[in-house]
Amino acid sequence: MTLTHHSTFIKGIEGSAEGEIEDVRQTTVFDPPFYGHPMLVPPSPSLTTMFRTRSTTPDEEGTAIAEIDQQDWDIMVKVPTYEYYGFVMYLVSMLGFGVYIVWALTPAPVLKFFEIHYYLSRWWALAIPTWLFVLVIYIHVVLNAYNTEVLTKPFSSLECIVDQYALVGEEDGAAHGRVVDLRLCDVNKQQLEET
């Protein structure tokens, strides 16, 4: 019974609605996990290459591809290099971190047993992360000092003077509703009373 129901459904699709389905398939964009909603970033070329609607083999007639179709085809077959580079960078960073952990924590006799003699001193295993931590703190202090000392205008600057002719922005408190946290039972009671 389900097989005949399924076959009649397919026949219905192949009938008059076939053109409409093709139009929908060509105009919609596959954008997980927000089905039916626009993506926040443009779709990557990898999604368009995974879900091709056009055949990759030429037609039997051997007709030339129109210029607009050729541009669409060039976009569809573009290699998604950003995804590949990101995955390779992930693998390389994990491999580098693993090598660093092995180098820092494995005892020297074990490394010599595996004929690994050319490695840096263990002092660098602590020195490099410590230097990086101090560098981050230094950058934080320098950026704050730069923002307050260089980018902030002095008090004697004309841009800091406020008088009766200055156009100072005023906040309209009445336009914004007061934000109050209510108990969940009160919110539910209010919603149920409205319905």
UniProtKB/Swiss-Prot annotation:
Source superkingdom: Eukaryota
Record keyword Nucleotide-binding present: no
GO biological process: GPI anchor biosynthetic process; meiotic cell cycle
Statement: the UniProt record of this protein carries the keyword Membrane: yes
Keyword list, A-Z: Endoplasmic reticulum, Meiosis, Membrane, Transmembrane, Transmembrane helix
Membrane association type: Multi-pass membrane protein
Protein name listed in UniProt: Meiotically up-regulated gene 84 protein
Disulfide topology: none
Pfam families: PIG-P
Protein function: Has a role in meiosis.
Principal subcellular localisation of the protein: endoplasmic reticulum
Location in or out of the cell: Endoplasmic reticulum membrane
TM region positions: 85-105, 123-143
Record GO cellular component, one term: endoplasmic reticulum
Encoding gene, per UniProt annotation: mug84
Organism encoding this protein: Schizosaccharomyces pombe (strain 972 / ATCC 24843) (Fission yeast)
Cytoplasmic topological segments: 1-84, 144-195
InterPro entries registered for this protein in UniProt: GPI_Anchor_Biosynth (IPR052263), PIG-P (IPR013717)
Residue intervals annotated with topology Lumenal: 106-122
